[in-house]
């Protein structure tokens, strides 16, 4: 498993496509479609994930989510990639990229790979050495 991605998108078709593509690339994916679900999931996961965020969810603009992340104590500093069909301006330091709809899935995956860290894997034993006894 590479890392964890939270996808906040209110279009069910696009959500499912992103789920499939990210699962195929070995990411753990959490799908949400509202501001409340997005914030709840991020609070539960902490800053150990990447948020792929629709700029305008059905229940409000992404700016409210970005402000809520900054207001958390301590602030939730997860990287955010915005999805938008129009130009987006934001002052949030969390926003690391914007993907303009429609976007190529390969481009989206490249952006996710750039900002979603892989979990640390334990080092493999040196060749020819026996595993340590417990």
Describe each PLM feature range.
Residues 33-50:
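Acidic, metal-coordinating helix/loop segments flanking the phosphotransfer/catalytic sites
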Residues 78-84:
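Hydrophobic/aromatic residues positioned on beta-strands within the core alpha/beta folds
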Residues 9-10, 54, 101:
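Acidic di-acidic motifs
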Residues 3, 62, 91-100:
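As written
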Residues 103-116:
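C-terminal output helix
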Residues 12-30:
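Two-component/phosphorelay signaling modules centered on CheY-like receiver
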Residues 49-76:
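Conserved phosphotransfer microenvironments
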């Amino acid at each position: 498993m590479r890392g964890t991605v939270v996808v906040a998108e209110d279009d069910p078709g696009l959500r499912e496509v992103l789920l499939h593509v990210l699962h195929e690339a070995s990411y753990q994916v959490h799908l949400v479609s509202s501001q409340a679900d997005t914030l709840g999931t991020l609070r539960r996961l902490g800053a150990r994930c990447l948020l792929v965020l629709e700029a305008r969810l059905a229940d409000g603009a992404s700016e409210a989510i970005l402000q809520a992340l900054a207001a958390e104590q301590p602030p939730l500093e997860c990287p955010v990639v915005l999805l938008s069909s129009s130009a987006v301006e934001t002052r949030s330091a969390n926003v690391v990229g914007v993907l303009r709809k429609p976007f190529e899935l390969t481009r989206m995956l490249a952006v996710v790979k750039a900002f979603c860290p892989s979990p640390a894997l334990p080092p493999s034993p040196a060749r020819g050495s026996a595993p340590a006894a417990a």
